Amino acid sequence: LETDRAMIRDGLVWRIYADPTDGTPARFVQQSDAALPVFHLAPGAYIVHAAYGLSGTTQRVVVGSSAAKETISISAGALILNAMVGDSPIPDSKVQFSIFVAVGTDPEGRLVADNIKPGALIRLPVGSYRVVSTYGDTNAITSADLTVEPAKLIKAILRHRAATVTLKLVNNLGGEAYAGTNFSVLTPGGDTIRDLVGAFPSLILAEGDYFLIARNNGKVFTSEFKVRSGIDQDIEILAR
């Protein structure tokens, strides 16, 4: 790794390509994932590509008739990401991360990696990134701008303001929920966020105000509710 000159002992993939002199594409020769690979090559010019996670570098080497040793530097660092609501870690099954690099003025211009789970070690080229954390599958999304530094491991926690709500259509508060109810969750402005069907479907929502519509047996019922971060709750609509 650049800066500290520490040898990388795992996570490497080496690929060797013959470097042709006639203008034809480089030809793959050998591959290894050893930290200190030894390649037996005929004399000639070669392109060495070293991949370290999502970062990598390429170097041209010329092999003679005697043994030679090459050292290649990679400008890379790493991230470990986690997410929380309040003081509680979010279960791995309910959150995932995506990493972007900016293109022009768009901080999420190009996707670098997605479907990243908490605690995973993500090796990246040195640079600035937008990390997006998605909690659940509705609108609980938060982001952070992080800088990957040479030979550094950055551990980041993204904090969500969200909660789980369970929707119910009932005759009386605390009563049995109607099966087969169609629910629509909307913003106060009337934009649909999510449609669900069932007696008591659950979803994760960002903190804020919402409007709920329940349809059952040809009848329509409505209600307003508020989501407070970290406070899971049942949202009951009275069928009357």
Predicted segments with their positions:
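A short, amphipathic beta-strand motif
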Residues: 1-6, 78-87, 164-173
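Post-signal-peptide, soluble extracytosolic/periplasmic N-terminal scaffold domains
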Residues: 5-13, 20-22, 30, 36, ...
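Short, structured motif recognition centered on aromatic/hydrophobic residues
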Residues: 10-17, 46-48, 74-79, 91-100, ...
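Short, acidic Ser/Thr/Gly-rich low-complexity loop/linker segments typical of extracellular
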Residues: 18-35, 102-119, 187-200
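Solvent-exposed strand-loop boundary residues in beta-sheet-rich modules
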Residues: 18-22, 52-54, 87, 101-105, ...
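Structured interaction patches on ligand/partner-binding surfaces of diverse proteins
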Residues: 33, 52-75, 136-161, 217-240
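Short Pro-Gly-centered beta-turn/loop motif in secreted/extracellular proteins
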Residues: 33-47, 51-54, 116-139, 199-218
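C-terminal functional regions that serve as terminal interaction/effector modules
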Residues: 136, 173-196, 202, 211-219, ...
